[in-house]
């Protein structure tokens, strides 16, 4: 992988520990992550983690942004998008808001409202996009925040699992998805 400098194949030509069971699950070995060319990403190394071609109903990417790297529009007609800053900082905007995001920062952009970004230095991002499924009379809206500002809450009453919800989907049916981080006690699952 270009990320960990483990180049070549383990035992045989095209050998990998990654598993893709189309429409069921995907396990990607870090050694097998590759750079992809994805339109709109400039001065970025993009790894496709999931896509409709793999059987998913979404596309998600791990993006390593180099200094001055940018994207000219994440989303599309009917597509909702989410961007999370794993490391670094960048400027983001959509039709509704602009923000400076640092590590832990995120932006959710509703359908047909593209996200653009530009990095000041190196940054690592998680990007997710999918077709929005509307409920009559309800709609989603832009959400900007930072995981570092959210409290950990007990997940569904469990004593060993905690959640940080990024979107208000638990009480706003205009959101057809959620993004969150789960944290488990050691040995719990």
Listing of model-derived features with the role each one plays in the protein:
Residues 1-44, 56, 60:
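Transition-metal
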Residues 1-3, 120-162:
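Double-stranded beta-helix
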Residues 33-73, 152-189:
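A short glycine-rich, His/Asp/Glu-containing loop-to-beta-strand
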Residues 44, 54-56, 97-98, 111-136:
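Ligand-binding loop in jelly-roll beta-barrel domains
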Residues 67, 77-95, 189:
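Glycine- and acidic-residue-biased ligand/ion/polar-headgroup-sensing regions
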Residues 82, 95-112:
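Short acidic-glycine-tyrosine-enriched beta hairpin
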């Amino acid at each position: 992988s270009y990320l960990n400098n483990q180049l070549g194949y383990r035992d045989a030509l095209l050998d990998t520990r990654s598993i893709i069971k189309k429409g069921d699950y995907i396990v990607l070995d870090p050694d097998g992550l590759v750079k992809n060319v994805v339109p709109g990403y400039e001065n970025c190394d993009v790894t496709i983690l999931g896509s409709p071609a793999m059987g998913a109903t979404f596309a998600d990417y791990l993006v390593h942004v180099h200094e001055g790297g940018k994207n000219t529009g994440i989303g599309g007609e009917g597509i909702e998008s989410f961007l999370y800053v794993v490391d670094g900082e960048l400027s983001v905007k959509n039709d509704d808001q602009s923000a400076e995001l640092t590590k832990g920062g995120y932006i959710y952009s509703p359908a047909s409202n593209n996200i653009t970004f530009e990095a000041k230095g190196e940054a690592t991002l998680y990007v997710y996009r999918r077709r929005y499924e509307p409920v009559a009379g309800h709609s989603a809206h832009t959400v900007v925040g930072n995981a570092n500002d959210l409290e950990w809450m007990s997940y569904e009453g469990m004593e060993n699992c905690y959640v940080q919800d990024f979107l208000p989907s638990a009480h706003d049916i205009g959101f057809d998805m959620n993004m969150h981080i789960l944290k488990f006690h050691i040995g719990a699952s």
